[in-house]
């Protein structure tokens, strides 16, 4: 029996690159979008279902990297109106949202839709998403099925700032394998 000595030498090193402004900007984009993605991960998992071998997180990052801008002072910002919380082949649902009251209440108004073979079924589940951008918190709201018209009211959580809330919607098939693209819903206020 032979006794051999295995010696492994590891060199611990930091990053030794000399980053160009483009590299620094890309790192800021990834850091900013990654921080948001971790906060809204349950929405991403539902909205990027069935993306294949990649993860829902990677699909979200890939779809939304263009929504992050970095200025010359290396300050990053996200265009929340263009943000995609879901991506897929289904047709987007027809939903409108209004905000009313002193304790803010969001009313989602759905229009009944017809079935389209392969792209929209009457039993597709429609979801609304309330996103508070300052706190980076989200609330997933289950609305009615695609074939049903109606309204769903959701009160705004007390600690949320109503001026910083963005609203989105998307549809998910009954088996939750196919989704639609998400749609940013402009808010109309009523007195």
Regions found by a protein language model. Name each.
Residues 52-191:
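Charged linear interaction tracts used for macromolecular binding and regulation
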Residues 1-94:
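Long, polar/Ser/Thr-enriched low-complexity segments
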